[in-house]
Amino acid sequence: MTSHGGGEVRGERIHTVQPERDLVANWEVDLSEKLEEYLLKICSGEITGNEEDGQIPVNFAEAALLLQGSVQVYSKKVEYLYNLVLRTLEFLSKQRDQEQSKGTSNENEASSSRQVDEEENDLFWNVDDIPVDTKNRLDSSVGGDTCPSQFVKPPANLVVLEGDCLDTSGDGGELESYLLATTHLYRDFILLDPCDAVAVNEFLGDNYGGKGRNSAHRGSSVRKSFHSSVGRSGGSARKSSVGKNQGTNVHLSPICGNGPNDQNCDQGSQPPVFEDNDHGFDMDNEYGGAMDFSDTDADEDDPWKPLNPYEPGKLKVKPFKKVKILKKIGWSITKDHMTSMFPLARPNGPISSELIEIWKMHGCASKDEQASQDIPYYEKLREMLVNGGNQPCGANGNYNDNDKDNHDEANNGDFHDFGEHDGDDAEHPFMDEDVLNMNDGGAAEFHNYDGFENGESNCQESLEDLCRSHLDALLANIAKSEKQTDLAARVSTWKQKIEQNLEEQELHPPFDIQEYGDRIINKLTVEESGNVETFTDLMKDQEKHEVARAFSALLQLVNNGDVDLEKPGNSTNEPMCYTAVKPFSVRLLKVHNRKNEKRGIHLPQKRAKSPITKGKSHESPPPKKRNTCSVSSQTRKVSLKISKINGVGVRCTPNSKKRRKGRSDDVTEVTEVASIEKSLGKL
């Protein structure tokens, strides 16, 4: 870029930046510095000369073009750099390919020697000649094939039991404290409690089902090794897993010595089988005898042997924690106790069995009285529902069913009396183990006693109550609907008429009472009948809504004093009904009265002040110019004042002081009336 003008002296001439045509010269120009100088000169006001003095004024269009050209120059620089980088990379890649093609022959020679060295090294790592030990082979059926779906949980009883040789003061991690030296393995697990065998089988599944005789013998040895740790524990392994493993049933095959066929027992073919059923933890075999895991010393190794309460234990004694007792527990216990002592009353009938007959007789008598009256249909339906579909009792109190002792009054049909028997009745036990009999399939068979039907009776009674309430609600709705049918029909017809009238009213133009009043007055002035016309002639050929609007406007005109209504044939002023045959007439009053009333309506006059004032001199008002329009209004004011004055003179006050003052006021009032009359005479 070049500078225009003398660049040696700064103050004589201003340097202006001009674009360079040569691309090589653009690399040497510091464009940012030039622009900063140019902007500084513009802001300082140095560019203020004329062209005659040799200074060029500021040309903003030229400056904008200069900026645009500088952007293009920079973009060209970036493009040149990009092309240069691409060509350099291409040259380097071609040179590398040539070097690789030349070096392939040398690499082949070097690789052959390298392979020989690798073969020599592989001979050192060859282990095919080493014999394989069969004992070191892992069981693939347990360890390799199956993978646990969750983390392994340690056995619950792998803890120190009471009575073990545990030194609490020393190291608690010794093997002797956990009795690991005296226990045996069961399916690769150390068991301190035989009940944990169920958890082991559940964890491993049925993977041992297809194993050979060795695993079977191992399973049969469980019977001997289950109680090895209990001997030293002093019977402290009594804790059962019944609470933890509820729903688990252990069905064992008949062990030799317990079943009837001891010779046919094969220990190597049938390992103990553990199944998961929902029958609880069953410790009995299928022959009714108790299962004994030990061989001879069953009494010594009994895990369920109770502890000696007088033998002190070696574990640390923890203090008892205070627990808040919930009130609900005590309340439920007391409630159950009270219900057992005092049975609940039945919904139908007395509690005491001695009063049942009397209650039945009263019930039949009341039914006879009701039967004498007219029973509605819904009452008959309800009575049939209460009686279970049978007819009600007769007048003599006899029921349709012959059995009176086992039936209730509310259940004359097939419903039995479920609350008849007391809790002390030995003939009808509620829950007795002797009642249960086993059928051929092994299921418990219950006899159909009345005591077992209490739940069914409650269900039946609740169903009856529900049906009664539903029937009552249904009948009430039917009665309401019957009453509301006529009213609903009338309301619907009225609603239709009103909606039609409202739609018609919306189509009519808005009501202007002044416009309708002007129409009536215009008709009365045009007629030649002396400003008197009947209302039927005025409303001839008019619609209903127009007649109603005109009548309301007529009433407003009467109130304003523009027109007057004449009632022919009514001298006594009694109320009469005027029709089109016998109409009333409308008389138009003076036109100027109507105009004055209009003016009075639009501009209401102020209320005239009372002339009775204290401490003021009553002077006559100043004379005014004559105005014919204000004569009537002034006469009205005068009459109003006179009436007020007369009213004040007649008024009586209870106080004597006010009477004396009233006499002096009467004199002033008389003088004021005289002055008002004189002023009116002058007008």
Curated annotation (Swiss-Prot):
What is the reported tissue distribution? Answer: Expressed in seedlings, roots, stems, leaves, flower buds and flowers.
**GO terms (BP aspect):** chromosome condensation; DNA damage response; positive regulation of DNA repair
Q: Where is this region: Disordered?
A: 96-119, 210-310, 392-412, 593-636, 649-683
- Reported induction: By boron excess (B).
Q: Does the keyword Nucleus apply?
A: yes
Q: Does the keyword Nucleotide-binding apply?
A: no
Q: Where is the composition biased (Basic residues)?
A: 214-226
Q: Where is the composition biased (Basic and acidic residues)?
A: 401-412
Composition bias, Polar residues: 101-114, 238-251, 260-270
| Phenotype reported upon loss of the gene | Enhanced sensitivity to excess boron (B), to zeocin, which induces DNA double-strand breaks (DSBs), and to aphidicolin, which blocks DNA replication, probably due to the accumulation of DSBs. Reduced root length, especially in the presence of genotoxic stressors, with twisted shape, ectopic lateral root formation and dense root hairs, as well as short meristematic zones.
According to the UniProt record, one GO cellular component term is: nucleolus
Q: Which UniProt keywords apply?
A: Chromosome, DNA condensation, Nucleus
**What compartments host this protein?**
Nucleus, Nucleolus; Chromosome
Q: Which family does it belong to?
A: Belongs to the CND2 H2 (condensin-2 subunit 2) family.
Q: Which PANTHER family match?
A: CONDENSIN-2 COMPLEX SUBUNIT H2 (PTHR14324:SF3)
Q: What job does the chain carry out? A: Regulatory subunit of the condensin-2 complex, a complex that seems to provide chromosomes with an additional level of organization and rigidity and in establishing mitotic chromosome architecture. The condensin-2 complex plays a role in DNA damage repair or in protecting the genome from certain genotoxic stressors (e.g. boron excess, zeocin and aphidicolin).
Oligomeric form and interacting partners: Component of the condensin-2 complex.
Protein name stated in the entry: Condensin-2 complex subunit H2
**Organism of provenance:** Arabidopsis thaliana
